[in-house]
C-alpha cells in the first residue's frame, strides 16, 4: 500500500500529538496537544455503543502514517474508536504508568522490560521491526560514510566536532543514541551536540537545516527523505550494518490489576489484531517512496516466548547472554523477513 507522507513537517515544535486515528486522512497534519486527560483509558462514547481505546505510541508509528492504515480496520472490526497519543517511547510508557492509556506500542526493549517488571504491563507481543540509521549531510564533513561500526562513527563525529542533533526526549531513538555514545566511550557535550527535545520528524528537519548528523529510525527517514537533503551515512542491520542499530517494536496492554478502569479487553483485542495475519499483512504492505517501512515478526512456526517476559528477568547473572540472544534473534528476523534486494 503506497502512502502520501504525513505532513508532520508542518508541525515544527509540536510535542505530544493527540488525534483520533481513522477520522483524518493521511495528508492532514496531526492535531497538537501537549496534555493528556487524567484517567483517559478505558472510556466509552456517549451513546454507549462505540468503545474507545487509548493508544500511547512512539512518534515513528504515527509520523510514518502506519496507524492510518491499521487503526481504521481495527475500529471497523470492533466498533471502536482509537485515540492515539503520539510521543516518545519514554513519555508513552509514562502515560501508561499514570493510567492514561489502555495499551502502548513502543520500541525500547529495556524500558518495556522495566514496565513489565514493575507490574504496569502484561502480555507483551512482538509486532514488527526495522532498524536505525546514522544520517548526515551529503558532503559528510566528519567522514563517517560506510563505517561498519555505529560507535566508531559517533566517536569520529565527536572528534571532528561536527554538529550532531539529538532528539533528547527519552524516546526509543534517544535511548538507542545514548547507548551508542556509551559504546563509543564518549559523553556528548559542547556546542557541537544539540539536544532539541523533539520528535523524529522535527529532528530530521533541524539536522537538515543545520548540516548536522543524527540518528533516525529508517521508517521515518524514508517517509521524509523527499523533503530533506540528508543521506544515510551508516547503515543498520537491514542492510548489513551493526546489530546495535536494531529496532524491534512491541505492543503491551496496561495491567488491569494496576488500573481497573483501563479497557483491558479492547487492549488485548488490539494486540491480537496487530499480531494477527490481517494486521501483519497491513504492516508488510505499507510503503513510502517505494520502500517497505516495517517488517512484521509476530507470526512464526516457532514463537519466541521471550517476547512475553523481560529479557533479563532472571537477574544480572544472565543479562549479557540475554542481550546476545536478542541480537541473534534479530539477525534471524532479518534473514527470514527482509528481502535480499531491500
Curated annotation (Swiss-Prot):
Regions of biased composition (Polar residues) lie at 24-37
What does the entry's PTM section describe? Predicted to be exported by the Tat system. The position of the signal peptide cleavage has not been experimentally proven.
The family database entries (PROSITE patterns) matched by this protein are listed as: TAT
Q: Which InterPro entries match?
A: ABC-Tungstate_binding (IPR052738), PBP_domain (IPR024370), TAT_signal (IPR006311), TAT_signal_bac_arc (IPR019546)
User: A Pfam family for this UniProt protein?
Assistant: PBP_like_2
Q: Segment Disordered: which positions?
A: 24-52
Q: Has keyword Kinase?
A: no
Tell me the first and last residues of the signal peptide: 1-32
Name the UniProt key words of this record, in alphabetical order: Signal
Q: How does it assemble?
A: The complex is composed of two ATP-binding proteins (HVO_1886), two transmembrane proteins (HVO_1887) and a solute-binding protein (HVO_1888).
Instruction: Read off the PANTHER family from this record.
Output: EXTRACELLULAR TUNGSTATE BINDING PROTEIN
- Physiological role: Part of an ABC transporter complex involved in anions import.
Protein known as: Putative ABC transporter anion-binding protein HVO_1888
Which organism does this record belong to?
Haloferax volcanii (strain ATCC 29605 / DSM 3757 / JCM 8879 / NBRC 14742 / NCIMB 2012 / VKM B-1768 / DS2) (Halobacterium volcanii)
